């Protein structure tokens, strides 16, 4: 794939302009034909009446002597055989049902695809364009589950990408992805016409690339011992031979692999391997890091304090590392991170302070700018360009540096106005470790919800950028941080189907994007994901069951009014009440959209496309007294002034789905909202001790310690608020992290509907306590106790 340059971005713009002038084709904003299985949507599509039927044995003809076209055609035939069971034969020269042609002009990634009764023609001037034409044809060939011959619609497509950088970032430092999984992701990216795979190869928790001159970077830095010692060792790395193979595999799919080695911060794994290149706080030049010890490779997520030193020896080490990086990676851009570099070690080091003084620098931010400038100059001497997260703006940028903006879009705006190229990757719109919905069945991750529509609605070019500055927007990138993504299944759940929305934003023109037209095509993409074995989330289409008026009202009335819906408002919802699996022939909702159900009820529901295809897995909801009195972790609220920011697993390195818990790292406190307390005699809490493995840096002092009455602490239950009457104090047993706890206690008699505050008083330097579910249990008739009861009698 050609290097990303301003010239390439101009070619993208020129291609789109040329397509706009092609009067024979439909305008971009014209209504999209129904259910064409194309994602991303092309720049121009014009229906052509009768289409083409492809039978087994149909020929793909490529220009004589065009080895690259033959390779692309062979790959297309292999994909169609894999996903359709239709065998196509590639031949050099002559006629064919499918013909590859070289256009005489046009940008290398633009293409035309014509499907007529006489055959299909794919034409482009460059290899990338031919490849993307093949992707579009493959999508049309695999629009449904039918195997064998396919009837293709008649149409003419003229297409080119809007942006030159259409990227996806995979963090392999926090959790390592084997080569086979990365190759699977590369193939999935190619199917969406994404063209940059950004690999986050180093962080505090692991160093993932072999550096032959410094073998301890992987012998030591690639491995860690998780909290609790299970497994005894976790990690992995890529040899240079493996990485070259990955790069070649990606290049065949017109994807550039961009490496990231984080510096000067997020350096703990490297410093664990070579402490002499960390910061000498003691000031005596001894080969050690931190306060007179070699750190372990971190098991804590978040922000850790370790930095690279800024002496000549440490800079030579980084240059040696970069020499091997540029020998492996042909990409123009080398990502150096630059984010979240706490300056505490630099501030505490006499040697670093002397270095700052000798350089005439007045702040540690200025020192980071000097550091980045030095690395940028070195990369420039190797013919490469530096790119880093938007923190590298602090203190000034090297002249040829580019910025990847994650803290919103302000960094991109500032850099573009300074004349620097930018890539947009804002956390609020493109960080795919945020959960796809607020459903109970979402796996671990950040609790900040990132629904697919927010991805689709993201616009990379801010309206306040004028045309000259907008030309510096190279594109955008979705980022998958993997603290809570330890397996391929969870990786695919996090990425798909949001990658489809990302691809359309990155490829299609702004005017061509249409959410309502995207949804039917997304349904076809979801069905294809299932056939391919991709573990895509169905959160967007899954039926959500909500009790209208609240659970307390349903308990009082002995019946529940429920609303059935899904996140995207697409499909027809059907349900059953007899335990059977809903089908396209099951009951539909009344006009009000509400169901009134006597207690108890067992509701099963799903959404269906117009052709009767289920859009998700059916969801089951029991609506009875026990369920209405239970709050899962996901249904508990944060205590006042708090925030439930993470959805954590029971075991940090579990490679499969595991129990998950919504937690506030700063305060182990939850609110059970609107509890109906009439007749309640007992509270049962399913709790857990989790690893407290999240680096809070300077915020660690804000963690709340509630006073304890026993060595291991208690779970307190307060009425109304966290300062209300103490209803129960459940003593915690001794134990360690990754344990589940079953806690129960009688409750004194109370009436009405009130909140309950539940908070742990355990030592904040030990495990993190969390709640899985809280159940209120009705007392046997005549067994409730009046308020108040002495707290001691409730333990």
Regions found by a protein language model. Give the residues of each.
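Flexible, acidic glycine-rich loops studded with aromatic residues
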Residues: 386-401, 407-560
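Extracytoplasmic
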Residues: 618-795
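Short, compositionally stereotyped local motifs that mark structural "simplifiers"
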Residues: 29, 61, 513-650, 691-696, ...
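Feature activates predominantly on carbohydrate-active enzymes
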Residues: 106-333, 374, 378, 477-480
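Bacterial N-terminal signal peptides
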Residues: 13-24
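Contiguous, structured surface segment used for ligand recognition
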Residues: 30-165, 490, 502, 506-532
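Bacterial N-terminal signal peptides that target proteins for export
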Residues: 2-15
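Active-site neighborhood of glycoside hydrolase catalytic domains
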Residues: 296-400, 406-414, 418
């Amino acid at each position: 794939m050609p290097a990303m340059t301003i010239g390439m971005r101009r070619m993208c713009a020129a291609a789109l302009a040329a397509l706009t002038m092609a009067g024979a084709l439909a305008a971009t904003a014209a209504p999209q034909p129904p259910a064409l299985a194309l994602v991303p949507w092309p720049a121009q599509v014009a229906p052509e009446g009768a289409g083409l039927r492809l039978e087994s044995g149909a020929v793909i003809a490529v220009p004589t002597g065009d080895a690259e076209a033959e390779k692309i055609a062979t790959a297309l035939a292999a994909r169609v055989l894999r996903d359709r069971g239709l065998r196509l034969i590639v031949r050099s020269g002559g006629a064919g049902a499918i013909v590859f042609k070289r256009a005489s002009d046009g940008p290398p990634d633009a293409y035309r695809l014509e499907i007529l009764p006489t055959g299909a023609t794919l034409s482009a001037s460059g290899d990338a364009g031919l490849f993307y034409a093949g992707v579009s044809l493959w999508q049309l060939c695999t629009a449904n589950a039918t195997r064998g011959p396919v009837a293709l619609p008649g149409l003419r497509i003229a297409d080119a990408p809007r942006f030159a950088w259409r990227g996806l970032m995979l963090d392999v430092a926090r959790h390592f992805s084997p080569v086979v999984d990365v190759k699977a992701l590369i193939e999935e990216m190619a199917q969406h016409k994404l063209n940059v795979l950004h690999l986050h190869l180093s962080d505090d928790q692991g160093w993932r690339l072999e550096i032959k001159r410094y073998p301890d970077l992987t012998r030591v830095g690639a491995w860690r011992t998780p909290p609790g010692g299970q497994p005894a060792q976790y990690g992995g790395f890529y040899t240079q031979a493996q990485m070259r193979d990955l790069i070649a595999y990606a290049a065949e799919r017109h994807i550039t692999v961009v490496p990231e080695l984080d510096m000067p911060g997020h350096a703990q794994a490297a410093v664990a391997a070579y402490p002499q290149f960390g910061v000498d706080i003691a000031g005596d030049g001894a080969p050690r890091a931190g306060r007179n010890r070699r750190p372990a490779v971190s098991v804590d997520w978040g922000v850790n304090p370790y930095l690279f030193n800024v002496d000549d020896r440490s800079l030579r080490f980084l240059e040696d590392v970069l020499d091997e990086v540029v020998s492996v990676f042909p990409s123009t851009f080398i990502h150096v991170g630059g984010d979240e570099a706490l300056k505490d070690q630099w501030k505490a080091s006499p040697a670093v302070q002397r270095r700052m003084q000798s350089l005439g620098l007045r702040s540690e931010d200025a020192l980071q700018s000097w550091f980045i400038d030095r690395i940028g100059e070195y990369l420039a001497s190797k013919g490469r360009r530096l790119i880093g997260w938007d923190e590298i703006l602090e203190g000034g940028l090297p002249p040829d540096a580019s910025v990847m903006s994650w803290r919103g879009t302000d960094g991109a705006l500032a850099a573009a106005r300074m004349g620097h190229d930018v890539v947009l990757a804002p956390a609020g719109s493109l960080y795919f470790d945020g959960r796809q919905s607020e459903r109970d069945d979402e796996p671990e991750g950040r609790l900040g919800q990132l629904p697919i529509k927010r991805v689709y609605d993201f616009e990379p070019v801010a309206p306040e950028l004028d045309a000259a500055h907008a030309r510096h927007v190279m594109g955008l990138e979705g980022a998958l941080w993997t603290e809570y993504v330890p397996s391929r299944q969870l990786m695919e759940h996090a990425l798909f189907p949001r990658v489809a929305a990302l691809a359309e934003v990155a490829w299609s023109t702004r005017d061509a994007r249409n959410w309502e037209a995207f949804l039917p095509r997304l349904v076809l993409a979801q069905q294809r994901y299932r056939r391919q074995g991709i573990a895509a989330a169905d959160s967007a289409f899954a039926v959500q069951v909500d009790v209208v008026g609240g659970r307390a009202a349903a308990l009082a009335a002995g019946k529940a009014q429920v609303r059935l819906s899904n996140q995207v408002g697409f499909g027809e919802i059907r349900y059953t009440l007899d335990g059977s699996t809903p089908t396209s022939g099951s009951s539909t909702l009344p006009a009000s959209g509400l169901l009134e159900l006597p207690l108890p009820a067992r509701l099963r529901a799903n959404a269906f496309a117009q052709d009767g295809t289920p859009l998700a897995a059916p969801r089951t909801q029991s609506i009875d007294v026990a369920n209405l009195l239970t709050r899962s972790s996901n249904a508990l609220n944060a205590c006042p002034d708090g925030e439930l920011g993470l959805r954590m697993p029971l075991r940090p390195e579990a490679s499969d789905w595991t129990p998950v818990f919504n937690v506030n790292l700063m305060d182990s406190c939850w609110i059970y909202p609107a509890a109906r307390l009439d007749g309640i005699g007992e509270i049962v809490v399913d709790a857990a001790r989790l690893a407290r493995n999240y680096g809070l840096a300077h915020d660690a002092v804000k963690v709340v310690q509630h006073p304890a009455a026993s060595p291991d602490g208690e779970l307190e239950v307060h009425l109304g608020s966290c300062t209300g009457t103490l209803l129960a104090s459940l003593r915690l047993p001794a134990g360690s992290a990754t344990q589940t706890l079953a806690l129960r206690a009688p409750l004194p008699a109370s009436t009405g509907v009130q909140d309950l505050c539940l908070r742990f008083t355990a030592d904040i330097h030990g495990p993190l306590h969390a709640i899985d579910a809280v159940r209120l249990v009705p007392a046997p008739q005549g067994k409730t106790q009046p308020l108040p009861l002495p707290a001691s009698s409730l333990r």
